[in-house]
Amino acid sequence: MKELVERIKNDGRVLGEGVLKVDSFITHQVDPELMEAMGNRFAEVFAEAGITKVITIEASGIAPALYAAQKLGVPMIFARKAKSLTMDEELLTASVYSFTKQVTSQISISRKFLSDADKVLIIDDFLANGQAAKGLVELCQQAGAKVEGIGIVIEKSFQDGRQLLEDMGLNVVSLARIASLSEGTVTFLEEDA
């Protein structure tokens, strides 16, 4: 997606071999117009898939997931990383390792929001080792829901996340694919959408 690639070139910062900082428009401060454009793009790509729910993990995946859900006319669910006092019903849970934060979290979704009748589009801000998306897939599997696709805002193609997900038979669509983050420079591959 050209607008996203340009924004990464202009405002993204490489912090190390595997870390890209995009806090001025995605992960801390959010650019609503860019989020809407990304959500709309995901909705266009998956328009014929019969999506009934869009799922993400809190926090940075929420904005593009919400815009995609709005465009598709379906609910959006975000998996929580910490159990809330208000989440006292039966939960779907999975363990997820975060490459950026270097911690493992338990993610959860209330079972009442996801069923075997659902066709799911998973959206996340980054794809590195694939563990976040894999955790969301596990939640869907626990509910019997079918994952129709995975939409990724920024893919670190030099890591093995895409391969992990494709080996699971999943359709992965990334708006920006990064070949490398070496020497402080972002090098891109051709994006999927």
Curated annotation (Swiss-Prot):
Q: Where is this protein localized, as stated in its record?
A: Cytoplasm
Temperature-activity profile: Thermostable for 60 minutes up to 55 degrees Celsius.
Metabolic or biological pathway, per its Swiss-Prot or TrEMBL entry? Purine metabolism; XMP biosynthesis via salvage pathway; XMP from xanthine: step 1/1
Top-level EC class, please? transferase
Q: Which InterPro entries match?
A: PRibTrfase_dom, PRTase-like, Pur/Pyrimidine_PRTase, Xanthine_PRibTrfase
Q: At which positions is xanthine bound? A: 20, 27, 156
Instruction: Give the EC number(s) listed in the UniProt record.
Output: 2.4.2.22
Which Gene Ontology cellular-component terms appear in the entry? cytoplasm
Q: Transferase: present as a keyword of the record?
A: yes
Keywords of the record: Cytoplasm, Glycosyltransferase, Purine salvage, Transferase
Where 5-phospho-alpha-D-ribose 1-diphosphate binds, per the record, is at: 128-132
A Pfam family of this chain = Pribosyltran
- Out of the domains of life, which is the source? Bacteria
- How pH affects activity? Optimum pH is 7.4-8.8.
Q: Which reaction does it catalyse?
A: XMP + diphosphate = xanthine + 5-phospho-alpha-D-ribose 1-diphosphate
Subunit info here reads: Homodimer.
Instruction: Note the NCBIfam families from the entry.
Output: PRK09219.1 (NF006671), XPRTase (TIGR01744)
Q: What is this protein called?
A: Xanthine phosphoribosyltransferase
Gene designation: xpt
